[in-house]
């Protein structure tokens, strides 16, 4: 299993409508790309205050590394990636491979 963690430092002018559109794109991925087990997204709720400007994030859980590797060049990934780049000043990606 691979957890694909993506953190976004949002631009100051990002609207709730834009974030809702982004969440909708993400939510549709499991039905469109084989090997995606789940998608979760939202703003940070951590009380620690250690986000360093990364106030929004999403987590895509893949069945395995092959599924993650198929997702990256997949045509359904492109709109997600493009919108993330529009919404964010900075993007941080961190993948964690674990056994079930």
Which stretches of residues belong to each language-model region?
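A common structural junction motif
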Residues: 27-33, 76-82, 88
């Amino acid at each position: 299993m691979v957890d694909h963690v993506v953190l976004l430092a949002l631009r100051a002018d990002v609207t709730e409508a834009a974030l809702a559109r982004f969440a909708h794109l993400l939510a549709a991925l499991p039905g469109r790309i084989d090997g995606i087990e789940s998608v979760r997204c939202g703003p940070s709720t951590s009380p620690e205050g250690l986000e360093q400007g990364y106030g929004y994030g999403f987590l895509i859980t893949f069945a395995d590394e092959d599924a993650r590797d198929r997702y990256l060049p997949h045509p359904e990934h492109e709109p997600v990636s493009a919108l993330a780049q529009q919404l964010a000043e900075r993007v941080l990606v961190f993948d964690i491979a674990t056994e079930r």
